[in-house]
Amino acid sequence: GSRGSLNEVALSMALIQGRNIFDKKIQLKSSEFAHKNDISDFQPMIRAWIYAYRAKFDYQKCHAFDIHSKAAREVLSIFRSLTDIAKKQGLKLNELSSNFCGESMAKVFLVGFYDNLYRKLSKSTLSCELVGSRRGKLEKGSLADASDIGVAAEVNEIEGKDVSVVISKSTSIKLPWLEEVLENFLTVQEISRFDKQRRRVITESITK
């Protein structure tokens, strides 16, 4: 369960707080650290960081994979302080793994970033509707782009000719996970309406 991915969650939090560990603007999906069945942008980010850590943040080794060695090193100190807090609270930390369970992490993010839950409005434009009727666009090359529902760790307003909202550091969500994790937050309403074509009253269940 989520307890088994505590270290990865702590590392994800450190990656959010720190600077981008990649040298240039890469699309995570095409990163050498992305795997076919990944559901979260954090999966290639964590693998890249583990590689940098094992390479002792060596500039040449990191640069070969577009990793910013200094930014990756900074993440280490944030990560250590977060794991120290977890240990003091008596939480048992798993061994950090590059092949951790995406589903258990997704469920943790659902609780932590509930306000950044979104649904895709269009596959072609990556337009999304966030909780609270906000609109935004999923970052290109996200590992969560195949899913209709997702949760983002970052939602940023980018000033330009128009203000655009960019949804990034995203994780795919499946409806059963949503119901399992957020059952206390969700309400199911039964709505009756008259269907003109079929000339009868239809009752629908809507989950909000």
List where the protein language model places each region.
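Second RecA-like catalytic domain
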Residues: G1-T207
